[in-house]
């Protein structure tokens, strides 16, 4: 799955690009092929499914479970990677994350909106507190998911209609 790249040989700046192709199968299951396009090439195969609420079979985690897992895993990865680069020894790391969304019923559908994102960090380290705090601050800035969630984003949707793509 992963190829070996020396971070010291990467350019000072780069675009990190991913793409994902999803195929609906079964009742509510989605099979996903995720490609890291640059600066390196990697491919991952994932799936999502829903439980009975949406009429699925719960054969894979629902998208929201993967969402919070991705956020938690991203900050944990950055803390561990940056601790090595910043020469900060950590003996143990645990993260407890919570996300709350608001859900509002509209006839037979619903709308959602994020309410809160909370990440509690437990680090065992003999390093001074200020160095551990600096590590967490650096990891926050290096976590692609946290940086994405921390700003307003525009998500463009297009629908294929015949030979054309229509903005939705």
Q: What role is predicted for each listed range?
A:
Residues 77-78:
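Short, well-ordered amphipathic alpha-helical segments that serve as non-catalytic structural scaffolds
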Residues 1-69, 81-168:
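Extended beta-strand/beta-hairpin segments
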């Amino acid at each position: 799955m992963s190829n070996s790249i020396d971070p010291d040989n990467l350019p000072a700046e780069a675009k990190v690009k991913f793409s994902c192709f999803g195929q609906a199968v079964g009742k509510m299951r989605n099979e996903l092929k995720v490609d890291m396009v640059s600066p390196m090439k990697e491919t991952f195969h994932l799936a999502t499914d829903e439980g009975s609420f949406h009429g699925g079979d719960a054969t894979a985690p629902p998208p929201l479970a993967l969402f919070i897992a991705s956020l938690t895993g991203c900050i944990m990865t950055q803390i561990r990677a940056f601790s090595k680069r910043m020469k900060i020894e950590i003996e143990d790391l645990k993260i407890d994350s919570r996300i709350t969304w608001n859900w509002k019923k509209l006839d037979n559908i619903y709308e959602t909106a994020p309410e809160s994102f909370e990440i509690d960090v437990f680090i065992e380290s003999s390093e001074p507190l200020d160095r551990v705090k600096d590590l967490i601050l650096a990891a926050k800035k290096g976590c692609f998911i946290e940086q994405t969630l921390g700003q307003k984003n525009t998500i463009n949707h297009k629908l294929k209609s015949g030979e054309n793509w229509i903005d939705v």
